[in-house]
Each structure stands twice: as structure tokens, then as C-alpha cells.
Curated annotation (Swiss-Prot):
This is Probable methyltransferase EP424R. GO terms for biological process: 7-methylguanosine mRNA capping; methylation. GO terms for molecular function: mRNA (nucleoside-2'-O-)-methyltransferase activity. The active site is at K268 (proton acceptor). One of its GO terms (cellular component) is virion component. Its main location: virion. It comes from the Viruses.
Length: 424
């Protein structure tokens, strides 16, 4: 937060400090050279988890202040309007789309482009993007590869959950699936009679194994694996991490089964306090030369979203490791995958990330949002006027830092639906 003071109509809002975006947050985790010992139900001394449990309680106490506002449509709407007003990147998507000839510019697009620009991956020319529709990650990678890396081509495969009901629409808002069916690994429910039918649900062990097989059959090597899955938890944000455990395990396992040696991985997560999540991070630390917990600047600071990044995969699964992990997904329980007492140095680094991202940044912005709600409930236009000059400065800075260039028409992805202007 920066010390800017505002005056309006003779009144002073000296507490109203523009929410200056933090820098890209990146916390490195140590590589684990000792052997990986997976367990079906590992036990962990409670003392190891105490500070993570305290962190969860502290964050949930702040989130709980918003719970009553979610119960009434009018107050819920006002709250989201206020949170939108203090989002320093609101409006950036449309600018990027029209200034740089970009496609499918969603929030996911901004985050992926920022990750690619910041993390300095060795190769992103062949990618498997999971939990992907409507396609923001693929589009950002395509834009980055052609404007920054100048690869002669970008090869990709992707998957997303295909709705089980014919009445539910596939989230193919831009026609990326419709126009590129050969790039997609999941199948319509109309093909259920097929022996190898796969609807893209990564909480099903057989689907995970099959998706990895399909990906490697169609694309080898795979230099980059991404997964942006998340279950809509409604208003129950206090259980967001817990409710997504199985999904996040499945999307991670799909990546570890398909990513080539030397490849890179980007996985969406939320808070990092549950013993199972911590154990999954410990597993990652055996496979990548570099491992990070990140929070892109363009990821809204009021949410718990984090991205785990692995660089330069060092080895593949052993048959035993693959068997144990697939079995755990099939018969899922949320006990740790490993003995966490063997990873205390790594857990210290994870906790530093929790402190930095959630206990400091997120709580600060949530408190700021609630104060704005109380003071600007019926003055949202005024709040927007105060913040507009700073938003422009921050957005212009983001565009410069992330080295955006115009995408040539010949490199654009094939989309069947007209590209609609981003809602921002």
C-alpha cells in the first residue's frame, strides 16, 4: 500500500490508499535429493502442522467478515462491485486484446503470460494444457511463443471436463474446442460406449492415466504442462483448499505422468495449509530442479489463488511410484502422501509463502476491501474516480514489464466463434 491522500468536496479520506500491486511473488523451495518414500496413509506429528492450522484460522476469520454480506443479493452485489473497483487490473484485458491483437484475453491469459515472462522457462514450444477451457492459457502461450520466443510453430494438446449432461454447455465460449477438435483429449458423453471413453474428469484415476497416454501419443516431447482446475465452492471459501484436494491431486498426477524430462509445470492451487497439499508439494520437490510457489501480480490479491511452478523435470516416475499414486487417487483419502517430518526445511519455505501471500497480502487487501465497502457502499462511482489514475499507471507498467508485442495474424489460433470483447 502506498501513502496517497485524496480530497473530494472538501473531505479527506486519508485512509484511502490505492492498492498498489505487489511485485510478482516467487518463493523458491529446496530440491529433495533423498529417496521418495510414498505411503498409502502417512502419519504426521501434529506439531508440524500447527502453524499452518493457525494460518488457516487467521485467514478464515478475515474472510468470515464477508460471509453475512453473501446472504443477501443486494449486499453481495455491492461487495463484488467494491472488490472490482479496488482491482488495479480491471480493464486491462480489453486493452491487451485490442492493442496487441491478442485472443481469449481472460484473467487466466494475463496470469499465464506473466508467468511465462517471469519464470524464464527453457522451452514452451509444445504444451499440454489441462482443465483448460475456454482457452486463456493456450492463447497466452501461443502469443508469448510467437512474439517473444519466435518459435516456428506452437504445438499443443488440451483437455477439460466435458459435461455429463447434454443440457450442460461445454465452456467453449470462443470456439477453441469446436475449431480444433484434434487437439483435445476429452470426449463427448455421446461416445460413452467407446472402450476408452474419457470425459476429462481428472478425479477419476483411469481418466488420468488415459489422458496422459493420449497426450504423449499425440505430442512428444511435452515441454510444458499447465493445469488451471478449480471447483466452484459457492460461498464456502473457508473450505476452498479442502474441497479441491482431489481435483488438484488429479491434475498434478496427469502432469507428472505426461511431462517429459527437462519439462516445466504450472499448477493452480489455493491456500497451502492442508497436510495433503503439503505432502503433494513435497512429492514435487523430488522431480524438479527448481520449484516455486508463485502469485502473479495479475492474480487478484483478495483471493487465495497460488500457482506452483516446477522447472526442469529431472526424472520420471518409477513403476511403483505411478502405481501408488494412481491407487491413492482411485481410493482417495486426504492423509499425507509422505512423512512430512522428513521435509521440515521445505515446509519452512512453504510457510514463508503462506505468510507472504495469504497472511500479509491477502488479509491486507481483504481488510481494505471491507473498509471500502463500509465507506463507499453508495458511492462506488466516487471510489472508481479516486482510483482511476493509479489503475492506468499500474496497467501501463504491467504491459511494459511483461514485454507485450502485437501478434501477427498468421500466428493467431483458429477460433470458430467471433472473439467477443472481454468483460472487464
Amino acid at each position: 500500500m502506498s501513502n496517497y491522500y485524496y480530497y473530494y468536496g472538501g473531505g479527506r479520506y486519508d485512509w484511502l490508499k490505492t492498492v498498489e500491486p505487489t511485485n510478482f511473488l516467487k518463493i523458491g523451495l529446496p530440491y529433495q535429493a533423498h529417496p521418495l518414500h510414498l505411503q498409502h496413509q502417512a502419519t504426521t506429528p501434529p506439531s508440524i502442522l500447527e502453524k499452518f492450522k493457525r494460518a488457516e484460522i487467521l485467514l478464515n476469520e478475515v474472510k468470515a467478515e464477508m460471509d453475512p454480506l453473501m446472504l443477501q443479493p443486494e449486499t453481495e452485489k455491492k461487495l463484488y462491485q467494491i472488490l472490482g473497483s479496488i482491482d488495479m487490473f480491471k480493464g486491462l484485458r480489453k486493452k491487451v486484446e485490442f492493442t496487441y491483437n491478442a485472443q481469449i484475453v481472460t484473467n487466466a491469459w494475463l496470469k499465464m503470460y506473466e508467468l511465462l515472462n517471469t519464470m524464464n522457462f527453457n522451452n514452451t514450444s509444445q504444451a499440454f494444457c489441462n482443465c483448460e477451457l475456454p482457452g486463456g492459457f493456450i492463447s497466452a502461450i501461443n502469443h508469448f511463443n510467437h512474439t517473444m520466443m519466435h518459435y516456428p510453430s506452437f504445438n499443443w494438446v488440451a483437455s477439460s471436463l466435458y459435461p455429463s449432461s447434454e443440457t450442460d454447455a461445454l465452456e467453449d465460449h470462443y470456439g477453441l474446442y469446436q475449431c480444433n477438435p484434434d487437439n483435445w483429449l476429452m470426449q463427448s458423453p455421446l461416445l460413452k460406449k467407446n472402450m476408452d471413453y474419457n470425459n476429462g474428469d481428472v478425479t477419476i484415476a483411469s481418466n488420468v492415466k488415459n489422458l496422459a497416454l493420449r497426450a504423449t501419443q499425440r505430442l512428444t516431447p511435452i515441454h510444458l504442462y499447465t493445469a488451471d482446475g478449480g471447483i466452484n465452492v459457492g460461498h464456502d471459501y473457508n473450505k476452498q483448499e479442502e474441497l479441491n484436494l482431489k481435483l488438484h491431486f488429479g491434475q498434478a498426477l496427469t502432469g507428472l505422468l505426461s511431462l517429459s524430462k527437462g519439462g516445466n509445470m504450472i499448477l493452480k492451487h489455493y491456500t497451502l495449509n492442508h497436510a495433503f497439499t503439503l505432502s503433494l508439494i513435497c512429492v514435487f520437490s523430488h522431480f524438479f530442479e527448481e520449484l516455486y510457489i508463485t502469485k502473479p501480480t495479475s492474480s487478484r490479491p483478495t483471493n487465495s489463488e497460488t500457482y506452483i511452478v516446477g522447472k526442469n523435470r529431472l526424472r520420471l516416475f518409477t513403476p511403483k511410484e505411478e502405481q501408488v499414486l494412481l491407487k491413492r487417487l482411485e481410493f482417495f483419502n486426504d492423509t499425507p502422501l509422505v512423512d512430512l517430518s522428513l521435509y521440515q526445511n521445505l515446509l519452512e519455505s512453504v510457510y514463508f509463502a503462506v505468510e507472504t501471500i495469504h497472511l500479509k497480502q491477502q488479509i491486507e487487501f481483504l481488510n481494505f476491501g471491507m473498509k471500502c465497502y463500509r465507506h463507499f457502499y453508495n458511492k462506488i462511482k466516487l471510489l472508481n474516480e479516486y482510483l482511476a489514475p493509479k489503475k492506468k499507471i499500474f496497467q501501463d507498467r504491467w504491459r511494459v514489464l511483461n514485454k507485450l508485442y502485437v501478434l501477427e495474424k498468421k500466428h493467431k489460433l483458429k477460433l470458430c466463434a467471433p472473439l467477443q470483447g472481454s468483460v472487464a
